[in-house]
Amino acid sequence: MDKFEKWLNKTLMPLASKMNKNHFISALSEAFMRCMPLTLGIALLTIIGYFPVPAWVDFLNSIGLAQHFSAVIGAVTSALAIYVTYNFAYSYVNRHEYNGHTAGLLSIASLLMLMPQIITVPVVKNIPTEFPKSAVVDSVSNVEAFQTVYTGSTGLIVAIIIGFIVSLVYIQLSKRNLVIKLPAGVPPMVVDSLSPAIISMVIFCLMFGIRVGFSYTPFHDIFNFSTQLIQAPLTGAVANPWVLMGIFTFGNFLWFFGIHPNLIGGILNPLLLTMSYANIDAYAAGKPVPYLQMMIVFAVGANAWGGSGNTYGLVISMFTAKSERYKQLLKLGAIPSIFNISEPLLFGLPMMLNPLFFIPLVFQPAILGTVALGLAKILYITNLNPMTALLPWTTPAPVRMAISGGLPFLIIFAICLVLNVLIYYPFFKVAYNKALEEEKAAVELEGSETA
């Protein structure tokens, strides 16, 4: 164990440190964090508008409110790529101490420039009340419009790429003073607005070249290129439940050695969000969610189950402790754990570098995820409400799962919770018995010294 720990400290710790200091990873994390006021802001409306009770949904449709819920929620979910590209460019450029707001606006404009802006619709003259079966469309018309398929989850990868390209160009040209020089008496607001005009021209010319260049390829645009060659393979891999369980297991493995799983979260989260919003789009359209297994594994195997380490089972096990040390730790860690904050328990036991807790800490995601997938098949769960992806990450698992899948998903929660306890209890019992012996020895020693 000592040799392995030294190897980790020599290899993974420097890598983790570099990744945490990396401007791209940091800006990427900040880009999604800055979207949280939007996603959390519509969380309540999302729950009301898509509450998983058919009678309620039918009622909203009958009084005409369903379309308004869809419109308000769509203003966030169907425009996520726009928000992310602005936030990324702002954060990245701001970290280099240049004007992040200007870079963010240039990034939005660049993203829109690269989008297909024409929708082809059929032209029908003398529209009858009913079309005969023999009717054919003999002509089409082009309508100028932006498609939400590109501004939403499908465009996230391109949004990040464009935000990064714009940021790099903006920073490099700013370093070379490729800006308009204005007299000293000009107000700062005017200077900030006019000085990057040349940089804007260069960036837009670059975007024009990218747009034209892709138009001559079989992909026709950068979005199809990204979807087919980048996004589809990556999401396909992560959507595999066994790969996802492996990633969560590796994250807990890092935690055991004191390395925060944010090391992989910055890379994984954009893919998970892309899949989550694809689920939301499908569900809102009345279709089955395309990434059902991902939702099931995430519900029980990620940090949405008592935080890192899946600590719900540990908290319940701690109620059996007779040790004063663990009784006090339970008071400190129980409530945070309910809301998926497990650090008080991880550091308080401690679980890190504690061989006793290696198995329950590291292998919970794989065990719970496998059982949940099996139970989902037995209970014939074929669709879930993905709107819970918009809820805060601190939402307790039973609340999230009840909204997402109703009674069948709550049954899975209950069974997995029992399993969670059974996995943690034997290891915790050894720990609290040892602590109890130490406390008794300390009391006896204190008594002998007093005598």
Swiss-Prot record:
Q: Name one GO cellular component term.
A: plasma membrane
Any one of the GO BP annotations: carbohydrate derivative transport
Pfam families per UniProt: PTS_EIIC
- List GO molecular-function terms, semicolon-separated: protein-N(PI)-phosphohistidine-sugar phosphotransferase activity
Q: Which phenotype arises from disrupting this gene?
A: The galP/llmg_0963 double mutant grows poorly on galactose.
Keyword Transmembrane helix carried by entry: yes
The protein's topology relative to the membrane is: Multi-pass membrane protein
Q: Which UniProt keywords apply?
A: Cell membrane, Membrane, Phosphotransferase system, Sugar transport, Transmembrane, Transmembrane helix, Transport
Name the species this protein comes from: Lactococcus lactis subsp. cremoris (strain MG1363)
Q: Function of this protein? A: The phosphoenolpyruvate-dependent sugar phosphotransferase system (PTS), a major carbohydrate active transport system, catalyzes the phosphorylation of incoming sugar substrates concomitant with their translocation across the cell membrane. Involved in galactose transport with PtcA and PtcB.
Primary subcellular site in the record, as a coarse category: membrane
Q: What is this protein called?
A: PTS system galactose-specific EIIC component
* Notes concerning its domains: The EIIC type-3 domain forms the PTS system translocation channel and contains the specific substrate-binding site.
**Keyword Transmembrane helix (UniProt):** yes
Lineage of this protein's species? Answer: Bacteria, Bacillati, Bacillota, Bacilli, Lactobacillales
Extract the InterPro entries matched here: PTS_EIIC, PTS_EIIC_3, PTS_IIC_cello, PTS_Sugar-EIIC/EIIB
Domain PTS EIIC type-3: residue ranges:
8-427
The compartments listed are:
Cell membrane
TM segment ranges = 40-60, 69-89, 104-124, 151-171, 190-210, 239-259, 263-283, 296-316, 332-352, 356-376, 403-423
